[in-house]
């Protein structure tokens, strides 16, 4: 199944909060994630794409104090900046994602955004014909999956996957995602978020 970009968030069975941003792509498969200084970036292997296509390279994750921000595009930094200025998470997520609208590229790509402090997960999606936001508090082993395209392209109203593996990329249905390119995995341990590029 092809999902484009995806967000996965919830708690492992041992209670560890986890979140993932993943890239699946048919058009630009030569990309990777770089992690540096509390942030993660989607970057192309070929630097010439940076100037040719602004949707290929972007900040996909930022840690702001106790909060983690994950998104599929240019909304990451404005959301994080609002959190840094003291704006509550719900307002930061909704105001920025809604204001920036879907990506006005040739595909009208929806924007998907997440903020979490490890206990509460604020998740949203803005598409040409859809604006939807939800607040979730998963129990141990529960996960929420939201993708740009395909079967998981709606903000879930209840957990729609089980986080029954230590590696969330091994949890069903993620291994079935076609054209997987790269991802960043965020884990909340000891009161802090850490980022791992995959």
UniProtKB/Swiss-Prot annotation:
Q: Name one GO biological process term.
A: 'de novo' IMP biosynthetic process
Q: By its UniProt entry, which HAMAP family does this protein fall under?
A: IMP_cyclohydrol
The entry sums up its family as follows: Belongs to the archaeal IMP cyclohydrolase family.
Q: In which pathway does it act?
A: Purine metabolism; IMP biosynthesis via de novo pathway; IMP from 5-formamido-1-(5-phospho-D-ribosyl)imidazole-4-carboxamide: step 1/1
Q: Pfam families from the entry?
A: IMP_cyclohyd
**EC numbers:** 3.5.4.10
The role this protein plays is: Catalyzes the cyclization of 5-formylamidoimidazole-4-carboxamide ribonucleotide to IMP.
Species name: Methanopyrus kandleri (strain AV19 / DSM 6324 / JCM 9639 / NBRC 100938)
Q: Which residues form a coiled coil?
A: none
Hydrolase as UniProt keyword: yes
Q: Which UniProt keywords apply?
A: Hydrolase, Purine biosynthesis
Its recorded name reads: IMP cyclohydrolase
Q: Which GO terms describe its molecular function?
A: IMP cyclohydrolase activity
